[in-house]
């Protein structure tokens, strides 16, 4: 029978390792502490932001365009372009290795006929014949000689509109630009001792690394960015490049101030934020063509990374705010594809990422000021999600993208199953990106944003790198931890998930077929078959079963078994000590605890109701211990639970133990049990109702509570799946034989299935009412 799962959990739920007990005790310990915050804090909330001051950055970023610098003579670094920006005609730059290469560059204005001009090159007056036939472009000309007393020859002219020129030392050569803008390219001159060549620039210049040569070529051909051409850009001396910058460390703990008991610490940290989105996709009832909701939900993610040689364990919670609700209605027919609501995040939305790690910075994050952060941006793209229809091509929601840009940081608290974590909440504003999203095989296309259908696009996580800085008030002794005001046993996040799961479970009650339920209730469900719908591997199922058993150990059902075991132990001791029949009768009634009740309470209508209600609450255990061939309430309860577990879309390893335990306690709260003696049936329910009647005629007879208590002790207890009122109604309207009546009284599953297959409305309504009682 399906109720085997409950008996198996009861049998095995006590095999919990001692280490698990110790860990659980430590995690559920609460502590209330009153703190005098001292002179640094006025409230127990985060103080006002006094300004972040300097936020050190541990990442050295080499600028693309470094400058401008004033005209000077120096030895440029190898593999760096000098981007020269002359304003007038004349000598632009000159350089030599004083051995076999003297190289200079001159600038000639537009529309110059062939003429001889005098230039000062390397301190000497030199006559050079020059010309520029272009009406609009300036002309750069290289003048080169190989001996100190030799003559200059002209090489590699560059016709330029932006009036920019470049020169670089690299790989035993001196590189320059030639050709005509906007299609200029590089050329070179071979030289020895190239790294010792000193350059003299006669105009402002910039320095660009070789890695950004494409950018340098873009400037040569098209000009500098507009901001570089304003009067607010002032050239500085090249010696400013020699200033030594202190490289910040990935981890910095700086003492800002201290008193006798407290100190202010500034924590600077490089961090790696990994996060992912979670979603909920709920299918509506009916023929399988309609979905009620596709929505975002908060997602927790735990990971490790290395920071300055130290392994850091981090925890993030990602949530969204300001979502946009869309819908699609393919028509009014039952087979038309419909999504009642699907959520999309766009430029009016925000993403919140709560970050915590196990470093010292988060250990005392209670009184904090001067909080600042600098984070990179990240793009999130949507994947393909197919809506599986029973027949026809599947609609596919595909595409969509947004970029996340840092928009601030505040203090926050993350809630996990056992603890609350003081953390940082990073707020991100969104901008929509290409491509747009669409639903293939529908009219929906060209919409921008990130839909909730598959926001992670098959990626395990998204990653953002950055750095934060804060000043925290902490105890002077590092061994002490700042007390927090609230308990650490906070389960809000788990309770929220359980609330959503309870709603889903309750809605699934309407989708259970009764004939299949009866068949499932007859199967011997064990832990592996019960949880096989969630995990496919045996190891995963075993781990999940262990978690369920740990939680089940604390259930009211397990506590009842423990109490019953103690009662039976006391009963056995009393039997061994006393030979009186009354003593045996009293102690043997440990199943019901009614011996004293029956003798102490006056037998009135109200007292009988109280007694039968008390007895009925204990009969579940008696029935489980004396299993019969008939079906019982726990068989139906377990079958409904199995069906809902297989259909659920929100169930996970964290919520499963809670759901299984709640189901064992709350499914079918109104139960009735009966005992049969010859032609008499005594039946009592947990709500205090009781009946005694004849099997042949269903005629009611006086109810004897003492007789009921004695029969409960000596006879099998049967679940009243079809209770007395239903049986009487069935007999009055349809008429049933004595054998059928006995089979229904014994809850024979074969007869129940026959009545259901015959679509008997009275039996169906009774079973449906039991299914609807399977609620959380």
From Swiss-Prot:
Source domain of life: Viruses
Sequence segments annotated as region (Spike body and stalk (antigen domain)): 248-479
Other remarks on this protein: In group A rotaviruses, VP4 defines the P serotype. Some rotavirus strains are neuraminidase-sensitive and require sialic acid to attach to the cell surface. Some rotavirus strains are integrin-dependent. Some rotavirus strains depend on ganglioside for their entry into the host cell. Hsp70 also seems to be involved in the entry of some strains.
Organism name: Rotavirus A (isolate RVA/Cow/South/Africa/Offal agent/1965/G8P6[1])
Motif interval(s): KID motif: 644-646
Keyword Cytoplasm: no
Residue positions of motif DGE motif: 308-310
Annotated protein name in UniProt: Outer capsid protein VP4
Coiled-coil residues: 484-518
Region Spike foot: start-end pairs: 510-776
Key words, A-Z: Capsid protein, Coiled coil, Disulfide bond, Hemagglutinin, Host cell membrane, Host cytoplasm, Host cytoskeleton, Host endoplasmic reticulum, Host membrane, Host-virus interaction, Membrane, Outer capsid protein, Viral attachment to host cell, Viral penetration into host cytoplasm, Viral penetration via permeabilization of host membrane, Virion, Virus entry into host cell
Intrachain disulfide bonds: 203-216, 318-380
Phylogenetic lineage: Viruses, Riboviria, Orthornavirae, Duplornaviricota, Resentoviricetes
Annotated stretches, region: Spike head: 65-224
Pfam family, one: VP4_haemagglut
Site, as annotated: Binding to sialic acid: 101, 190
Any Gene Ontology biological process: virion attachment to host cell
């Amino acid at each position: 029978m399906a109720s085997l799962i409950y008996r198996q959990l009861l049998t095995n739920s006590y095999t919990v390792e001692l280490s698990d007990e110790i860990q659980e005790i430590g995690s559920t310990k609460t502590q209330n502490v009153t703190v005098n915050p001292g002179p640094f804090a006025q409230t127990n909330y985060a103080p006002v932001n006094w300004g972040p001051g300097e936020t050190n950055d541990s990442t050295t970023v080499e600028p693309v365009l470094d400058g401008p610098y004033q005209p000077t003579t120096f030895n440029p670094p190898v593999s760096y372009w000098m981007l020269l920006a002359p304003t007038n005609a004349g000598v632009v730059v000159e350089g030599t290795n004083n051995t076999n290469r003297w190289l200079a560059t001159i600038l000639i204005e537009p529309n110059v006929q062939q003429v001889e001009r005098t230039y000062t090159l390397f301190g000497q007056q030199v006559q050079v014949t020059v010309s520029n036939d272009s009406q609009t472009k300036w002309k750069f000309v290289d003048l080169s000689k190989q001996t100190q007393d030799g003559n200059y020859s002209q090489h590699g002219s560059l016709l330029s509109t932006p009036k920019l020129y470049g020169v670089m030392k690299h790989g035993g050569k001196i590189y320059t630009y030639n050709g005509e803008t906007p299609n200029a390219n590089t050329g070179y001159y071979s030289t020895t001792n190239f790294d010792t060549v000193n350059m003299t620039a006669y105009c402002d210049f910039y320095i660009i690394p070789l890695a950004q040569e494409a950018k340098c070529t873009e400037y040569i051909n098209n000009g500098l960015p507009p901001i570089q051409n304003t009067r607010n850009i002032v050239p500085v001396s090249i010696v400013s490049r020699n200033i030594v910058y202190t490289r910040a460390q990935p981890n910095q703990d700086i003492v800002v101030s201290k008193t006798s008991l407290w100190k202010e610490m500034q924590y600077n940290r490089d961090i790696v934020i990994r996060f992912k989105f979670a979603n909920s996709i709920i299918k509506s009832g009916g023929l399988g063509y309609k979905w009620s909701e596709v929505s975002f939900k908060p997602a927790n993610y735990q990971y490790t990374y290395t920071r300055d040689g130290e392994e850091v364990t981090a925890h993030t919670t990602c949530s969204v705010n300001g979502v946009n609700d869309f819908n699609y209605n393919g028509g009014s027919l039952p087979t038309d594809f419909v999504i009642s609501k699907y959520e999309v995040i766009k430029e009016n939305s925000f993403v919140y990422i709560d970050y915590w790690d196990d470093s010292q910075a988060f250990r005392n994050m209670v009184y904090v000021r001067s909080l600042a952060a600098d984070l990179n941006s990240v793009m999130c793209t949507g994947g393909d999600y197919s809506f599986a229809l029973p027949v026809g091509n599947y609609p596919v929601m595909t595409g969509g993208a947004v970029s996340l840009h840092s928009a601030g940081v505040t203090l926050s608290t993350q809630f996990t199953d056992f603890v609350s974590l003081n953390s940082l909440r990073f707020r991100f504003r969104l901008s929509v990106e290409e491509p747009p999203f669409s639903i293939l095989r529908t009219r929906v296309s060209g919409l921008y944003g990130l839909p909730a259908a598959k926001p992670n696009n098959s990626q395990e996580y998204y990653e953002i790198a950055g750095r934060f800085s804060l000043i925290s008030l902490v105890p002077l002794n590092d061994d002490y931890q700042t007390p927090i005001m609230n308990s650490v046993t906070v389960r809000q996040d788990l309770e929220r998930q359980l609330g959503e799961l309870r709603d889903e479970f309750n809605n699934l009650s309407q989708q259970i077929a009764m004939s299949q339920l009866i068949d499932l209730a007859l199967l011997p469900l064990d832990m592996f078959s019960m949880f096989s719908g969630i995990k496919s591997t045996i190891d995963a199922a075993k781990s999940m079963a262990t978690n369920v058993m740990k939680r089940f150990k604390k259930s009211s059902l397990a506590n009842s078994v423990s109490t019953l075991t103690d009662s039976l132990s006391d009963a056995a001791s009393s039997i061994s000590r006393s030979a009186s029949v009354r003593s045996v009768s009293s102690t043997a009634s440990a199943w019901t605890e009614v011996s004293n009740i029956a003798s102490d309470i006056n037998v009135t209508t109200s007292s009988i109701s109280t007694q039968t209600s008390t007895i009925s609450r204990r009969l579940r255990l008696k029935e489980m211990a004396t299993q019969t061939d008939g079906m019982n309430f726990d068989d139906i309860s377990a079958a409904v639970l199995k069906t809902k577990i297989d259909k659920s879309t929100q169930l996970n390893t964290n919520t499963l133990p809670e759901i299984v335990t709640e189901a064992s306690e709350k499914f079918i709260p109104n139960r009735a049990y009966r005992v049969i003696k010859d032609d008499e049936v005594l039946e009592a329910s947990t709500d205090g109702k009781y009946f005694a009647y004849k099997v042949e005629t269903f005629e009611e007879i006086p109810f004897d509570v003492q007789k009921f208590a004695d029969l409960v002790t000596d006879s099998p207890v049967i679940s009243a799946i079809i209770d007395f009122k239903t049986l009487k109604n069935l007999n009055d309207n349809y008429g049933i034989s004595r054998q059928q009546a006995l089979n229904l009284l014994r809850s024979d599953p074969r007869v129940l299935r026959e009545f259901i297959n015959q679509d008997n409305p009275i039996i169906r309504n009774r079973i449906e009412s039991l299914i609807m009682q399977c609620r959380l």
